[in-house]
């Protein structure tokens, strides 16, 4: 059986014509039902003939992730633990904010791998190890779950406004499925997200950077977190295989649109990378590119190997960057009361023994 959510539009068109003997326009109808109307069954596709729906049901399935756990923070952040068809667990987070007009808008943080191979020592997902890549259908299934949860089926005026590939996994190590996902996200007859509303975050893997940039399908964010190679080796051991100097050199020629900048994510770890000497090194790196900095304050949980930086060090770090004409914004952490950081909810479920593969999952 073909999981139809794993097909690009071109693949769906070929499936409909070759496998079902349908005219090409039928693929467009099915495609819009899948991605714009969030259909979970072929029976919902009321402008498709019953005979065609029956043939679709014989040869294809629509597989959404099942919702295992939902947690909502006092600040409105909502975290989902999702079970995939093979029992694997991934997380996605909905982060609310208000527009300038005061209307609600949601940013969704997406996972692209089950686990992660990068082994970053400050990240809960990094301690779990890597299981497998997610498919396009599994990646985009997170968006379908979010839209269903929000009652958001209005492509002309959606509540779900922005998508960030900053959940579990390294996008550039699953480049093929991530790129397939981005094309469907950008498709005006698909999920219809503007590239300006999508950000792909990488630990700094050079391979795939240029392909992502030349595609124009999303903005780029780089999880930097270290001002020099020595600290990078210590806190991001796998990412350190790609030297910082080589990464910055690659970013110097990264294709950017007018007024577009690379966003550098920098997690402030108390006593590790939050000193003025680190800020000086950071300026030397970032000033080589058209970049800006998001400063993230580490929020330790019990048993974590790092401490939060003091307010004084945070302020001094930020002010030094601004004094050197580096745009630096302290990003507010949300969902701290529900373990909204990457991998924390899955880790807590595993510790309780409720997330074993193959366990029964409730309906979404």
Swiss-Prot record:
One protein family per Pfam: Radical_SAM
Where does this protein chiefly localize? cytoplasm
Q: Where in the cell is it found?
A: Cytoplasm
Task: Cite the SUPFAM superfamilies for this sequence.
Answer: Radical SAM enzymes (SSF102114)
Q: List the record's Gene Ontology CC terms alphabetically.
A: cytoplasm
Cofactor(s) named in the record = [4Fe-4S] cluster
Q: What's in the keyword line of the UniProt record?
A: 4Fe-4S, Cytoplasm, Disulfide bond, Iron, Iron-sulfur, Metal-binding, Methyltransferase, rRNA processing, S-adenosyl-L-methionine, Transferase, tRNA processing
Cysteine pairs bridged by disulfides in the record: 109-342
What the entry lists under InterPro entries is as follows: Aldolase_TIM, Methyltransferase_A, RlmN_N, RNA_MTrfase_RlmN, rRNA_lsu_MTrfase_RlmN/Cfr, rSAM
**Enzymatic reactions:** adenosine(2503) in 23S rRNA + 2 reduced [2Fe-2S]-[ferredoxin] + 2 S-adenosyl-L-methionine = 2-methyladenosine(2503) in 23S rRNA + 5'-deoxyadenosine + L-methionine + 2 oxidized [2Fe-2S]-[ferredoxin] + S-adenosyl-L-homocysteine; adenosine(37) in tRNA + 2 reduced [2Fe-2S]-[ferredoxin] + 2 S-adenosyl-L-methionine = 2-methyladenosine(37) in tRNA + 5'-deoxyadenosine + L-methionine + 2 oxidized [2Fe-2S]-[ferredoxin] + S-adenosyl-L-homocysteine
Please give the function described in this protein's UniProt entry: Specifically methylates position 2 of adenine 2503 in 23S rRNA and position 2 of adenine 37 in tRNAs. m2A2503 modification seems to play a crucial role in the proofreading step occurring at the peptidyl transferase center and thus would serve to optimize ribosomal fidelity.
Tell me its family. Answer: Belongs to the radical SAM superfamily. RlmN family.
Q: What is this protein called?
A: Dual-specificity RNA methyltransferase RlmN
